C-alpha cells in the first residue's frame, strides 16, 4: 500500500503546469524558451508574472497534495516523507515529457510546508525578503533551504525531519546545478 502512494505522489509531481502554461499562453513548449527549465521561474520570465505565479502555486500544490494524501492514508512518517520526495522527483523528471522537468523548488516548498510547517513558513518569509532585496531566486532559495534544517532543529522536530530538511533541498540543489551546467555547455 505505501508503494502505491509513492507512485501516486510521483505521478502528481509529473503534472506539467509550466508546460501547459507555455502552450496556453504562447502555443510554445516552455522547455524551448528562456533557460529551458520547466518551472515557475522560467514561466515568470518568459510568460509573465501571472503565469509564473500560477505555475508556482500549482507546483507547490503538487508537493502539498502528495503529503496530504499520504497522511490521510495513515502512512508512517518515513513513507510520508518518501511520498514528498517522489513528488519532487516527478516534477524534476516527468515520465511524460522525456524526463525533462523543472528543478523542484516550488514542489519541495509544498512538501516542507506540511512536513515542517512553522520552520518552512519562517524560512519562506526570509527567502521572500531576500528575493525582494536581491531579485535573485537563487539567493532566496539558498537562504531559505540552506537554513531550513536549523529552523527545524530549533522547533524541536524529530531527527528524521531534520535529515529530510537537509536531503530534500540537496535534491533540488543538485538538480539546479546539473541543469545549469547543461544550459552553459
Swiss-Prot record:
Cellular component terms (Gene Ontology): plasma membrane
Function (record text): Catalyzes the transfer of an acyl group from acyl-phosphate (acyl-PO(4)) to glycerol-3-phosphate (G3P) to form lysophosphatidic acid (LPA). This enzyme utilizes acyl-phosphate as fatty acyl donor, but not acyl-CoA or acyl-ACP.
SMART domains in alphabetical order: G3P_acyltransf
Residues that span the membrane, as ranges: 1-21, 47-67, 69-89, 113-133, 137-157, 158-178
Name listed for the protein in its UniProt record: Glycerol-3-phosphate acyltransferase 4
GO function term, MF aspect, one: acyl-phosphate glycerol-3-phosphate acyltransferase activity
Alphabetically ordered keywords of this record: Cell membrane, Lipid biosynthesis, Lipid metabolism, Membrane, Phospholipid biosynthesis, Phospholipid metabolism, Transferase, Transmembrane, Transmembrane helix
Keyword Lipid metabolism tagged: yes
PANTHER family per UniProt: GLYCEROL-3-PHOSPHATE ACYLTRANSFERASE-RELATED, INNER MEMBRANE PROTEIN YGIH
Catalytic activity: an acyl phosphate + sn-glycerol 3-phosphate = a 1-acyl-sn-glycero-3-phosphate + phosphate
Matching InterPro entries: G3P_acylTferase_PlsY (IPR003811)
HAMAP family referenced in this protein's UniProt entry, alphabetically: PlsY
Enzyme Commission number(s): 2.3.1.275
Subcellular location: Cell membrane
Enzyme class, first EC level, given as a word: transferase
Subunit field text: Probably interacts with PlsX.
Species per Swiss-Prot/TrEMBL record: Dehalococcoides mccartyi (strain ATCC BAA-2266 / KCTC 15142 / 195) (Dehalococcoides ethenogenes (strain 195))
Membrane topology: Multi-pass membrane protein
Record flagged with keyword Membrane: yes
Amino acid at each position: 500500500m505505501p508503494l502505491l502512494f509513492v507512485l501516486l505522489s510521483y505521478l502528481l509531481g509529473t503534472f506539467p503546469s509550466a508546460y501547459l502554461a507555455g502552450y496556453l499562453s504562447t502555443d510554445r513548449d516552455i522547455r524551448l524558451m528562456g533557460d529551458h527549465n520547466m518551472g515557475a521561474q522560467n514561466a515568470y520570465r518568459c510568460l509573465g508574472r501571472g503565469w509564473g505565479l500560477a505555475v508556482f502555486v500549482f507546483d507547490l500544490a503538487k508537493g502539498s497534495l502528495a503529503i496530504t494524501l499520504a497522511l490521510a492514508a495513515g502512512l508512517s512518517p518515513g513513507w510520508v516523507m518518501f511520498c514528498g520526495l517522489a513528488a519532487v522527483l516527478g516534477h524534476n523528471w516527468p515520465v511524460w515529457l522525456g524526463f525533462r522537468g523543472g528543478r523542484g523548488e516550488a514542489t519541495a516548498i509544498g512538501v516542507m510546508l506540511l512536513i515542517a510547517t512553522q520552520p518552512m513558513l519562517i524560512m519562506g518569509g526570509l527567502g521572500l525578503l531576500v528575493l525582494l532585496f536581491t531579485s535573485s531566486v537563487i539567493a532566496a532559495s539558498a537562504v531559505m533551504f540552506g537554513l531550513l534544517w536549523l529552523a527545524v532543529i530549533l522547533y524541536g522536530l524529530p531527527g528524521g525531519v531534520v535529515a529530510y530538511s537537509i536531503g530534500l533541498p540537496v535534491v533540488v540543489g543538485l538538480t539546479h546545478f546539473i541543469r545549469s551546467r547543461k544550459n552553459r555547455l
